[in-house]
UniProtKB/Swiss-Prot annotation:
Disulfide bonds: none annotated. The keyword Transcription regulation does not apply. One of its GO terms (molecular function) is orotidine-5'-phosphate decarboxylase activity. Its EC number is 4.1.1.23. Catalyzes the decarboxylation of orotidine 5'-monophosphate (OMP) to uridine 5'-monophosphate (UMP). Pathway: Pyrimidine metabolism; UMP biosynthesis via de novo pathway; UMP from orotate: step 2/2. GO terms for cellular component: cytosol. It holds the Pfam family OMPdecase. Substrate binds at residues 8, 30, 58-67, 117, 177, 186, 206-207. This is Orotidine 5'-phosphate decarboxylase. It catalyses: orotidine 5'-phosphate + H(+) = UMP + CO2. The active site is at 60 (proton donor). Keywords: Decarboxylase, Lyase, Pyrimidine biosynthesis.
Length: 227
């Protein structure tokens, strides 16, 4: 299981400060929509210059098929090692993205976004008129058939997804509160033990790391517990 540290801070200087504190550790860094819109593709290079970190560019691309393919081709060429697209864009869109990226010499990992971990059952049903777990498994099957590398889901869907697709189909699970920290705006959260027992391939941890007094210490503690 790999740790992905979410850099959802107020400015690039703060993000880079945390990245420097994590230098030498076996972690991925997650750059979200706010940071990318604010700091641009040069920020990816700045992070890689700190320690050649692997970068998950979390933009959750969602549009018509050709626009998604165009966008993913662009962001695949700026140094991102993993990107994500919304499964709810549909089979045609996901096929279009993978067909386009297959032409690149070195494409990033591509994950589907299933149900955001800010959803609970009631709020998800209001939008999709369906149950979370059934929908996520359905999204995962279609994503797997389209050739994506994995899916973003909650810890609680990870095993069901692997059973429905393949043990090699990656699950990246946000909403991780390693040692019982506050849920904040997340609904479907889990601790490290639950993530490990559900065979998450990547866990995403943000605020418990970057809001701590010693980000490196808490990161080392997490790595110790998952390796």
């Amino acid at each position: 299981m790999k740790l992905c540290v979410a850099l959802d801070l107020a400015n690039s200087d703060e993000c880079l400060r945390v990245a420097r504190e994590l230098k030498g550790l076996d972690v991925w860094l997650k750059v979200g929509l706010r940071a990318y819109l604010r700091d641009g593709f040069k920020f990816i290079n700045e992070l890689k210059n700190v320690d050649n970190f692997k970068i998950f560019l979390d933009l959750k691309v969602h549009d018509i098929p050709n626009t998604m393919a165009d966008a993913c081709e662009v962001i695949s060429q700026i140094g991102a090692d993993m990107i994500n697209i919304h499964a709810s864009a549909g089979r045609v869109a996901m096929n279009s993205v993978m067909e386009r990226l297959s032409k690149l010499n070195n494409r990033p990992l591509v994950l589907a976004v299933s149900a955001l971990t800010s959803f609970d059952e009631e709020s998800f049903s209001e939008i999709y008129a369906a149950h979370i777990k059934e929908s996520v498994v359905k999204f995962s099957k279609i994503s797997y058939e389209c050739g994506l590398d994995g899916i973003v889901c909650s810890v609680y869907e990870s095993l069901d997804i692997k059973n429905a697709t393949s043990s090699n189909f990656l699950t990246l699970t946000p909403g991780i509160r390693p040692f019982g920290e506050s849920n904040d705006d997340q609904k479907r959260v889990a601790n490290l033990k639950t993530a490990m027992s559900n065979k998450s391939d990547f866990i995403v941890v943000g605020r418990p790391i970057y809001q701590s007094k010693n980000p490196r210490e808490i990161t080392e503690k997490i790595l110790y517990n998952i390796t």
